[in-house]
Design a protein with these regions (language model features):
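Residue-level signal for inorganic ion chemistry
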Residues: 26, 71, 132, 163, ...
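Short glycine-enriched loop/turn motifs at secondary-structure junctions
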Residues: 178, 211-212, 243-245, 278-279, ...
Length: 459
């Protein structure tokens, strides 16, 4: 038995002590986690800057602050979330009472990506703790400084074998995903998600897969172009475009395309200055592998660049880039970009834009900028996507009352707020029947009982 397997079975043993099922225990662990995150704030911010070049304002808002808010909500609502439900019972089951009891799955695996390497460990972990599970965390090896901080924080905060961190790369992940966990929560690419799903199926382990895809932005002829440009630039170029719900491409009505490109270019200068590489507010690509993938896409689209296009390998810097005259068969349109390159395509009618999106895998997010209520309702009703926004980008993630998750190729399952608790919770149903009364209608022999059975099911 290797070290990873030993940690897995030790975690299972801790769960079997029944300690995590106590509500006061769960609330105390969440309280300890909140305190630890606050204590480690400067270390977390420094690690995020080292690994991804994140400005501390952006890093706090998208990694630390949102996590602390989720802990606060979970602690406040946990008593209500965990209540056993007494549900209605049909008359033909009299004298019976029916219940749904919330119970933890057991020992869960959380695999996190590099783009929000702190938040995307702790958001699902909050749900796992609140639901009463033990957990093993696999942070991304592409953000090693953040991973080391997470491991120190976890080891200093929680009991051994309760919450564990496994560092490493592909080999460690392969070992983990083939173990018989009670639940697997994965955030990452579609290709790796398929591998995780297949491995989990060998042990019939339920999964949540949070993946990505090409999330479109539709800008119609009624849109407020200035507002659209600001909110699109924020959504696309935050974290240097390395956001699973970032706008991947724009579908703009041909009549306002030139105005939009002008506005986007102006907004980028307002956000990051004339020399964007020197801006303290603009991030970096996570590593050279992803840098070279993105510069290859840039090189294939040199004739289409209308803003940006510069890069610096030593700094893993890629300038925010706008591409015009892009077609559906362009190289940039064949894969999720996951970087600061924004293709702009045009359409003539909303029917055409909707058909374009219909022909592609269901996106994780979709955004529409429009003042036309009819257009808004058509997009919401006719297109399938994980989540999205009208006249904004990204910000639907900031509401913990909304479920977050994909559909189709962009993922399965959902979390955030109570939905995180629900994800890591098994709803166990049972009935309690009195021994004092028994109709006997459902028991053999059945002679003469047919009319009574029919009568029961009419009620």
């Amino acid at each position: 038995m290797n070290i990873i397997e030993q940690k897995f079975y030790d975690s299972k043993a801790f769960f079997n002590t029944q300690q995590t099922k106590d509500i006061s225990f769960r609330k105390e662990q969440l309280k300890k986690l909140s305190k630890a995150i606050k204590s480690y704030e400067s270390d977390i911010l420094e690690a995020l800057y080292t690994d991804l070049g994140k400005n501390k304002v952006e890093a706090y808002a998208t990694e630390i602050g949102i996590t602390l808010k989720s802990i606060k909500i979970a602690r406040k609502e946990l008593k209500n979330w965990t209540k056993t439900k007494n549900v209605d019972t049909p008359l033909y089951l009299f004298p019976t009472k029916s219940y749904i009891k919330k119970e933890p799955y057991g020992t869960v695996l959380i695999i996190a990506p590099f783009n929000y390497p702190f938040q995307l460990v702790f958001e699902p972990l909050i749900g796992a703790i609140a639901a009463g599970n033990t957990a093993i965390i696999k942070p991304s090896e592409l953000t090693p400084n953040v991973a080391r901080v997470i491991k120190r924080l976890i080891n200093e905060t929680f009991y051994a074998n309760y919450i564990e961190v496994i560092e490493g790369g592909i080999e460690e992940t392969q070992t983990l995903i083939h173990l018989p966990f009670d639940y697997v929560f994965f955030t990452g690419s579609e290709n790796v998600g398929k591998i995780v799903y297949q491995a989990a199926s060998e042990n019939l382990v339920p999964v949540t897969l949070e993946m990505g895809g090409k999330s479109p932005v539709i800008v119609d002829e009624t849109a407020n172009i200035k507002v659209a440009s600001e909110r699109i630039c924020f959504g696309k170029f935050t974290n240097a475009g390395q956001t699973c719900v970032a706008p991947d491409y724009i579908l703009v009505h041909e009549s306002v395309k030139d105005d939009l490109i002008t506005a986007l270019s102006k907004t980028l200068r307002e956000f990051y200055g004339q020399n964007i590489q020197q801006s303290p507010d603009y991030g970096r690509i996570v590593n050279l592998k992803h840098y070279h993938r993105l510069t290859s896409l840039l090189n294939s689209a040199q004739m289409n660049i209308v803003f940006g296009g510069h890069s610096d390998e030593d700094e893993r810097y890629i300038e925010p880039t706008l591409l015009d005259h892009v077609t559906s068969d362009s190289a940039i349109m064949q894969e999720e970009i996951f970087g600061p390159i924004l293709p702009i395509l045009t359409y003539q009618s909303l029917d055409e834009a909707i058909a374009f999106i219909h022909q592609r895998p269901k996106p994780l997010s979709l955004y529409l900028f429009s003042e036309d209520e009819n257009a808004t309702q058509r997009v919401i009703n006719e297109l399938s996507f994980g989540g999205g926004a009208i006249n904004d980008t990204l910000m639907h993630l900031a509401n913990p009352k909304l479920p977050f998750g994909g559909v189709g190729a962009s993922g399965m399952g959902r979390y955030h707020g109570k939905y995180s608790f629900d994800t890591f919770t098994h709803e166990k149903s049972y009935i309690f029947k009195s021994t004092r009364l028994e109709s006997g209608v459902h028991l053999p022999p059945y002679k003469g009982k047919f009319k009574y059975i029919k009568a029961f099911f009419k009620n």
